[in-house]
């Protein structure tokens, strides 16, 4: 159905992992940046606590129409709100304060850092931000690769690893997930 662009979709094992993480977190408020055809959103929505809601941020009406159909078919559409506009606008319009439990970022790589900062400012202590594609096909370790997306992911990985506000671990599932937990105030490193 999707052809070669289907590679933009998360892998099934990543979907199962996102569902499990959302359940472990008892997430009631989740954000996804980059929705594509909605598989990752289904995975997160299935793991939400009763009454939980997922805000999906995307710019493509074409792909999110497919997502909306899949959400209906999966029985999770009532848990998802979709915003079609640049994610930075959607995130900056969210209320200040620690209201987000869980976030998944899988969108334009050059803006990962911006999305990180906007979500982190609204993430509860011990909340989780998960980034996709952090291995980027192995190209992040090849310093000769100076493509814009590769540089952005490499910089994000380095920044988050040294950010004292969080602790993180890279998980080599599919193209790599970076799990980033917000530290509680006064938490000892």
PLM regions with names:
Residues 4-189:
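S-adenosylmethionine/decaboxylated-SAM
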């Amino acid at each position: 159905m999707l052809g070669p662009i289907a590679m933009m979709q998360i892998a099934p094992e990543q979907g199962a992992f996102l569902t499990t993480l959302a359940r472990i977190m008892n997430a009631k408020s989740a954000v996804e940046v980059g929705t594509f055809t909605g598989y990752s959103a289904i995975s997160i929505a299935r793991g939400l606590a009763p009454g939980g809601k997922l805000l999906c941020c995307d710019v493509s009406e074409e792909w999110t129409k497919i997502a909306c159909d899949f959400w209906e078919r999966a029985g999770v559409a009532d848990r998802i709100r979709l915003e079609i506009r640049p994610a930075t606008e959607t995130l900056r319009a969210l209320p200040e304060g620690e209201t987000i439990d869980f976030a998944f970022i899988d969108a334009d790589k050059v803006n990962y850092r911006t999305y990180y900062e906007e979500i982190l400012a609204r993430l509860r202590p011990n909340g989780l931000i998960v980034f996709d594609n952090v291995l980027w096909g192995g190209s992040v370790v090849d310093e000769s690769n100076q493509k814009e997306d590769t540089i952005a992911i490499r910089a994000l990985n380095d920044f988050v690893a040294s950010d004292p506000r969080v602790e993180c671990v890279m998980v080599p599932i599919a193209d790599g997930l970076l799990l980033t937990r917000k530290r509680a105030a006064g938490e000892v490193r």
